[in-house]
């Protein structure tokens, strides 16, 4: 059966699945993280280690992608992964009151929960992106990548803002009810959105009778220079991107005495800024063909670094009214940087050896996950360490400065490996 490229409606349906992923994950990385640090007064390194563990589990992403390449059905991996993610998120929420009542019991439940979250995101997210790379017409891949990522950011922002509005006055019971509604709704919407797309597109191939061993397939992909260079770029840039993920809400709570609802809403506003940055680049670079994608990613990285320096100054001067606008600006520049990298990833996934789209997406997803875990844990650990030597505001500020330096380094790497021509499609130079 010949492949029928995805229609725009099908692309938006797949984007809805990405939206559901973001809606669940944001509860773990922002709301639950803040509750551990501020309400339960636990060290920031604890939620940092749990989130790093969930990212570490995602080192299995290449394996999930390879399985979906060879089993002939990506839909079941998408739905099954979303189910694991929903169950893990519910367990993570249940662990909050358990941590307060019995620390070790709560910690044990948290470890299992974050492990399920990592496996769910890896199985569902990798298979979803592989399906898109396989079934989307080449000319639509950059736009499809932008649409699905924007929908994920939209889901993150709307969930964070809405949860922030209904979470106050805070209670464990209210928090558990909110998480149950979000996770149950996300799983149901995913099943409805994905159903039938793979079969109608004609990409539900027969399973490979004698598939190559996973490690042999992974070595084939690593031998491709473009894939290898892009993996290194993803790791560095995502380390910078995720360093503030676990500390921004505690920063607002500890330095500016913001409530859980206020900091959750701030997180949603930041992701709203990411959304706007992605829209700008999508319209300017793809629609109007203004500037090269390399220029956009460099501008995003350097803008992020400058904004982090500004947030440090805001903290030292105690200018609370400027905090949320600065955080939105940081999100805006983050979005500029991210959308170009996503376009390049979608283009490269379909190049090279056939029936390896899932493995390539898994490789880059694993690099992103490792970097995210490393960056998040490093940010949290630095804050804990520096708070022993200086006041809280200065400790957060020093961490933000280091994150800004990594963004500058990522910009320099992008200049070396990305094509500087003004084009609507991202291209990575397969050399240095």
Show where each model-derived region lies.
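Juxtamembrane intracellular "pre-TM" segments in multi-pass secondary transporters
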Residues: 1-8, 198-231, 255, 428-432
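C-terminal ends and interior cores of transmembrane alpha-helices
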Residues: 82-104, 302-318
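Cytoplasmic membrane-interface "Motif A"-like loop-to-helix N-cap segments
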Residues: 70-87, 103, 286-302
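Short amphipathic helix-loop junctions that connect adjacent transmembrane helices
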Residues: 30-45, 246-263, 384
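Helix-to-loop junctions at the C-terminal end of transmembrane segments
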Residues: 59-73, 167, 277-293
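C-terminal transmembrane helical hairpin of 12-TM major facilitator-type secondary transporters
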Residues: 294-341
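A membrane-interface helix-boundary motif in multi-pass transporters
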Residues: 74-76, 106, 164-184, 292-295, ...
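Glycine-rich segments within core transmembrane alpha-helices of 12-TM secondary carriers
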Residues: 57-58, 142-167, 364-378
């Amino acid at each position: 059966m010949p492949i029928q490229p995805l229609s725009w409606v099908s692309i938006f349906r797949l984007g809805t699945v990405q939206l559901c992923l973001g809606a669940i994950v944001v509860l773990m990385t922002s709301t639950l993280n803040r509750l551990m640090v501020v309400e339960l007064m636990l060290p920031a390194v604890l939620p940092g280690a749990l989130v790093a563990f969930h990212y570490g589990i995602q080192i299995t992403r290449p394996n999930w992608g390879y399985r979906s390449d060879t089993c002939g059905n990506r839909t079941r991996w998408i739905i099954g992964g979303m189910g694991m993610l929903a169950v893990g998120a519910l367990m993570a929420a249940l662990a909050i009151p358990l941590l307060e009542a019995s620390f070790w019991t709560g910690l044990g439940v948290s470890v299992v929960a974050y492990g399920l979250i990592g496996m769910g995101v890896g199985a569902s997210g990798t298979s979803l992106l592989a399906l898109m790379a396989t079934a989307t017409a080449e000319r639509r891949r950059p736009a499809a990548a932008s649409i699905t990522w924007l929908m994920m950011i939209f889901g993150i922002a709307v969930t964070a803002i809405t949860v922030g509005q209904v979470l106050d006055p805070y209670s464990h019971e209210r928090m558990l009810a909110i998480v149950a509604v979000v996770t149950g709704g996300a799983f149901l919407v995913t099943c409805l959105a994905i159903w039938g797309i793979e079969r109608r597109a004609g990409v539900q191939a027969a399973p490979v009778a004698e598939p190559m061993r996973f490690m042999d397939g992974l070595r084939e992909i690593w031998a491709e220079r473009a894939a290898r260079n892009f993996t290194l770029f993803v790791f560095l840039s995502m380390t910078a991107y995720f360093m503030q993920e676990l500390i921004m809400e505690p920063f607002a709570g500890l330095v500016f005495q913001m409530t859980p609802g206020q900091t959750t809403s701030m997180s949603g506003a930041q992701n709203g800024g990411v959304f706007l940055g992605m829209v700008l680049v999508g319209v300017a670079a793809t629609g109007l063909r203004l500037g090269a994608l390399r220029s956009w990613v460099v501008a995003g990285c350097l803008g992020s670094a400058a904004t982090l320096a500004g947030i440090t100054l805001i903290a030292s001067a105690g200018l609370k009214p400027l905090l949320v606008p600065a955080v939105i600006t940081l999100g805006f520049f983050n979005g500029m940087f991210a959308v170009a990298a996503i376009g390049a990833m979608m283009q490269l996934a379909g190049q090279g050896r056939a029936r390896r789209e899932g493995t390539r997406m898994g490789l880059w997803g694993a690099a992103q996950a490792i970097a995210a875990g490393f960056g998040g844990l490093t940010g949290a650990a630095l804050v804990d360490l520096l708070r022993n030597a200086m006041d809280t505001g200065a400790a957060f500020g020093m961490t933000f400065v280091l994150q800004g330096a990594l963004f500058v380094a990522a910009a320099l790497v992008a200049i070396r490996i990305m094509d500087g021509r003004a084009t609507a499609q991202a291209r990575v130079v397969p050399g240095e």
